[in-house]
């Protein structure tokens, strides 16, 4: 090998010098190393052929040694025998012949001249790069392009500024790094016995968010918060904090979690989960938003202090506003407060009212709903939208004054006309200090007045005077009863005055004879006439039970003079109004029947509800005798009339004299005039109402009193005015007859135009009760309306009324009932076959599911209803207790139903199609349901709703309560709960005889 290297070294020497320094040299001259040698002086040295190295002590004694060729096989001497021969590992012939061998000495490739270049004409000189080319609207093709050496390289992952994709890039979109709002926290480390560091928090703080409306007026129960956070873990401690200044809740809650001993990480995990869940969105309950955080360090105290300071500042602002209002009101003149309109006095019932005038509500189109939402924090009773304005009625005076102080001038509502905020100012109408009723006043008057004494001596003196006064009254009464009374009675004894007694007896006998003779002559002249005290005939002879005699005493003396106190103490007969009306009708009918009973010998109905022992004997007497004055258990003074009264009765005409009948009858028959809404008689009916001179004289007196102040003389125009009125009455009668002939009913007078043009009147809402006068489907007739327009032969045949038609109809009804029963039998068999096939297949399938209710339903349809909007009608006769249709809809939970009901009310959907199955399930047919939802309410329904189970599921089914005819409307009772607020009640338009008037 060629080359050399020179290096000093040291080795151990035997003399005093421990180490001897030598020189190791190598030169690229082809000589080989011969090992360590000694010189002539005995010093050791290393040498090579052709180059010698001398030691320090004898450098001149070195002699050159020629190097031998590489091919000599002489093994070099190595005194240490540990250092290998220095040679190249790949310096061999088999490696030197290879092209890739690299000469480490010359630092070049061997045989470089025999190498070939790799460049070709197909490949660019400087290489190539890969890019893409657009071949379609959404497709790209990779291509090769020559690389330019002067072009700088670009990171293919970065999009350039011009927006074009770089060649070789992975994606054309620029990838942005996600923005961090905070440092990313490490994952939570579970807490156990090997946990290092402070204990993690296991308490959370629930406090109101700053976005809530202040102050928080909603009443929130602690149980709601506690029950909700119980879902995260077991709660060991729950605490609510109050404001120390006002003792009002701060709505700040401290919740501490716990867990079983086997799970030490459970409370910490529960607190962490609760805080993480509401980290971004607040916890909302009852309209109040709450933040949830972990209780760390002094967070709880800082939150409490902040809320207490806010409440104190709010109280300071309220007091300041109160003082400003007081100063303002003291400086202004007292405002004249108007009262409540007369038509609202009963509704308001002398309660405090806040009033907003109509000039504000009408112009900005405010209604009661706007104020109802804005004043929802206050305990108001009712909000009335009147034509004079809006009246807000409160239960008590405190809430009314609080609303006036805080909301008057501060309440802002957006105008529905200008869409700008309007400041509302209230006018306070204080309730009148009215006196109590007469009974209360009487009690207050009779109640002894409480007297206070300043000392004990005054009390003893007053007590002594009262005792002496009572003793004086007792002694006086005792003297009158024991001494004065017996002396007076003994003096006035009739035995002491026999002449006076005999004279009085004679006068009484003569008077009695005269009355009897007068009575007989009166009966012979007019056998059907007698005195006014005998109008009730033999019914008064009916004996009463002992318990009813006292109550009947007032009935016997019905026309006698009684004191007002006695009349006030008598209790009226308590009966339902419908029964009283029935009694009135029956009495009129029985009046005519009672006159025929005497001649025909039939039993007459008695006015009393009890039977007597001598009724049979009395009736036998009535059959054989002429009508006479019945005997009554009355004193003679009441049973007989004096001479003057008898002569006065004889002077009256026959029609004015009392008639012998069981019930009193009027002189003239009752004229039932058809009055309109104005309660005024027309001119012709008014003339018919004047029967005799007595009526005319009374009318003349009334008119003369009313016409005293009239100075104009209308006498010349009176004939023309009368003729014009008669012409108008006649024309109105012709119009009314034409309306009845065309529309089967007279138009309501309130529907007429007041200005002569309906366009000038503008739009107005017509009540459903008035629509029946001009809409056919709103008319309630005896027979069901054919609003479905089924052109069947049964309707035509039913109008003939022949016996054959009725028999055919009955036969058809029987056939229909039999066919419906057969249909149910076939459906049950079909259902059994399906169940058998399902069991044979071995799995459930919707193809084999059958709803039995759809097969059993009757043919019904919906059309315009006479009750309300749309109704459900039967297309064929339906027998009682038969299934009609299923109430189909969306099955939802109770909380969802409440939310939807509020949403429907806000959106303007007036009708409610929510039907409750049980406490947790409600059927909503508002947007997804069948035609069964069109069934209207009626107080006398023809159907009923039942909840049955079909294949294990609850269904709502409508059944018939009675036989239902063709084209008859189907109704059932909604059974709504009664509303306490009169303004929230819905009127019932069913038109049934027993209609309750309201749905709720």
Curated annotation (Swiss-Prot):
Q: Which GO terms describe its biological process?
A: methylation
Q: Which stretches does UniProt call biased (Basic and acidic residues)?
A: 549-566, 574-591
**Residue ranges for motif RxxxRR motif?**
824-829
Name the Enzyme Commission number(s) assigned to this protein: 2.1.1.354
List the GO molecular function terms: histone H3K4 trimethyltransferase activity; RNA binding
Q: Which UniProt keywords apply?
A: Chromatin regulator, Chromosome, Methyltransferase, Nucleus, S-adenosyl-L-methionine, Transferase
Q: Where is this region: Disordered?
A: 29-78, 543-644
- Which top EC class is named for this enzyme in its record? transferase
Which Pfam families does the protein's record reference?
A: N-SET, SET, SET1_RBD, SET_assoc
> Post-SET domain: which residues?
984-1000
PANTHER family for the chain: HISTONE-LYSINE N-METHYLTRANSFERASE SETD1
State its role: Catalytic component of the COMPASS (Set1C) complex that specifically mono-, di- and trimethylates histone H3 to form H3K4me1/2/3. Binds RNAs which might negatively affect its histone methyltransferase activity. COMPASS recognizes ubiquitinated H2B on one face of the nucleosome which stimulates the methylation of H3 on the opposing face.
The protein in question is named Histone-lysine N-methyltransferase, H3 lysine-4 specific
